[in-house]
Amino acid sequence: MAIETILVINKSGGLIYQRNFTNDEQKLNSNEYLILASTLHGVFAIASQLTPKALQLTQQTNIENTIPYIPYVGMSSNRSDTRNGGGNNNKHTNNEKLGSFKGDDFFKEPFTNWNKSGLRQLCTDQFTMFIYQTLTGLKFVAISSSVMPQRQPTIATTDKPDRPKSTSNLAIQIADNFLRKVYCLYSDYVMKDPSYSMEMPIRSNLFDEKVKKMVENLQ
C-alpha cells in the first residue's frame, strides 16, 4: 500500500496537518486541501446519519467493531526480521525506542473501531482513501495510490471459516493499524509538546520525521 498523503482533521472539520509523500506536480494547493478537509467532515457527518436507526439503537450488535492487530504495519522490516529469528546485525534496530512506547511495536492487541457509523473507505478510479476516527472525533486520513478492484476476491479466515474476508476489508484493517500508529505518534510528539494548542495546526518536525519514516516503511 503506497501512501501519497496524510491528513489530520480536528473534530470541527478544520485541517490541522497535511503532508504529501510524492513529487506530483499536480498536487492540490493549501486552500484546496482546506476545502477537501471540510468536505470530508461534512460527508462523514452525512454518512453517520444514513446509518439505519435500528442499528444505532442496538449498538450494531451484528457488526464487528474490533479491528484485529496486524503485526509491524509501517514498522522497519528489521524489527520483524529480529522477531522471526534474524541475526545479531538487526539488534540495533530492534532496540530503537518508539518514543514513550515500550516494546518493538506501538501496540500488540486488537483495538476498538470508534468509527461505527461514519465513512471508513472511499474508492475511486484513481485512488483509495481511508479514514480512522478517534474517540474524541479527531480524524486521520490516508490517501493511497492503490486502487481497489470493483469485484473483490475473498480470503478465507481461520477463526470464522463461514465468513470470508474480502481484500477490501483487509486493506481497511491494514489502514486502521497504520493510522492508529500515526495517532500514537500524534499523542507522543504533538500532544506532549508544551507549545502546542489544541485544535490548532501541527508544527512539529519530530512528528513529520516519524510519520515520513512510517510511510516509507509501509511502501
Curated annotation (Swiss-Prot):
GO biological process: chromosome organization; endoplasmic reticulum to Golgi vesicle-mediated transport; intra-Golgi vesicle-mediated transport; macroautophagy; retrograde transport, endosome to Golgi
The UniProt record lists the keyword Lyase: no
Record keywords, A-Z: Autophagy, Endoplasmic reticulum, ER-Golgi transport, Golgi apparatus, Transport
Keyword Endoplasmic reticulum attributed: yes
GO cellular component labels: cytosol; endoplasmic reticulum; phagophore assembly site; TRAPP complex; TRAPPI protein complex; TRAPPII protein complex; TRAPPIII protein complex
Subcellular location: Golgi apparatus, cis-Golgi network; Endoplasmic reticulum; Preautophagosomal structure
A Pfam cross-reference name: Sybindin
Cross-referenced Gene3D superfamilies: 3.30.450.70
InterPro entries according to UniProt: Longin-like_dom_sf, TRAPPC
Classification via CDD domains: TRAPPC4_synbindin
SMART domains: Sybindin
Subunit (UniProt): Part of the multisubunit TRAPP (transport protein particle) I complex composed of BET3, BET5, TRS20, TRS23, TRS31 and TRS33. Part of the multisubunit TRAPP (transport protein particle) II complex composed of BET3, BET5, TRS20, TRS23, TRS31, TRS33, TRS65, TRS85, TRS120 and TRS130. Part of the multisubunit TRAPP (transport protein particle) III complex composed of BET3, BET5, TRS20, TRS23, TRS31, TRS33 and TRS85.
Family of this protein: Belongs to the TRAPP small subunits family. TRAPPC4 subfamily.
Stated role: Component of the TRAPP I, TRAPP II and TRAPP III complexes which act as guanine nucleotide exchange factors (GEF) for YPT1. TRAPP I plays a key role in the late stages of endoplasmic reticulum to Golgi traffic. TRAPP II plays a role in intra-Golgi transport. TRAPP III plays a role in autophagosome formation.
Further comment found in the protein's record: Present with 3130 molecules/cell in log phase SD medium.
Protein name (Swiss-Prot/TrEMBL): Trafficking protein particle complex subunit 23
Organism: Saccharomyces cerevisiae (strain ATCC 204508 / S288c) (Baker's yeast)
Organism lineage string: Eukaryota, Fungi, Dikarya, Ascomycota, Saccharomycotina
